[in-house]
Amino acid sequence: AEGKIIEILGNVGDVGLEILSIIKQNDLPLEFPPQVIEASKRVPKSIKQSELEGRRDLRDLPIVTVDGDDAKDLDDAVYVKQLGKDEFLLGVHIADVSYYVKENAVLDKEARERGTSVYLVDRVLPMLPERLSNGICSLNAGEDRLTMSCEMHIDRKGRILSYEIFPSVIHVRHRLSYRIVREILVNGDEELAQKYEQLFHQPEAFLKLGNRLLVLPVPDEPPAEKPRTKPPAEHDR
């Protein structure tokens, strides 16, 4: 059998060589094609007032993201409020990527080809160019972002009483990490709790709801109740 060198990745001992070898062995794409980069440049860096039409404005809510310390593409955010002794409101907000990435367009085809973002020890191979994944499609703190939201009313046993899915616009107040949330809710860090007082004015609500949901089985079917088509009453938020 004969073989030939098709590419030299580096020298033995080079930093990152092992990771690069894994990338090559699995035929993972390192770069985006020029046409994909060009398409990403045509996507705006911020949203316009006209784009808010038909979306529910949730920018007044203290919504936060909770991710790893090194995460850059923040695609989901949450808000929770205890409505009464036996009921919580949980809002989950997902970046509305489909608003910017149209079906069968260049960006969509590239994302389908990649299938997912790949997280390695020293880098991330994103499904979309960083201008989108870390920019307008990332729920960065202090920025208005277009989202798809699901608001759920959950009882004290963790059962979903009702839910509603709708297009929205949010303004993330803080970028939290799992470490920060753990320090506040589990370890009782008073300094951090004071810093994020507005968000954790009901820390027991976060903790109680989190404990309920962690032990729930994942249902095969969504709740029987259909999503509401009208906005919830003001007291729901």
Per-segment meaning from a language model:
Residues 6-8, 167-169, 224:
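A glycine-rich phosphate-binding loop feature that marks nucleotide/adenosyl-phosphate handling sites
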Residues 1-91, 98-143, 182, 198, ...:
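Charge-lined substrate channels and their catalytic hotspots, especially those that engage the 3′ end
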Residues 32-34, 105-107, 161-166, 209-213:
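Short, mixed-charge, low-aromatic patches
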Residues 201-237:
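N-terminal low-complexity segments that are often proline-rich with Ser/Thr-Pro
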Residues 79, 91-93, 151-153, 212:
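Residue-level recognition of well-ordered beta-strand positions that form the cores
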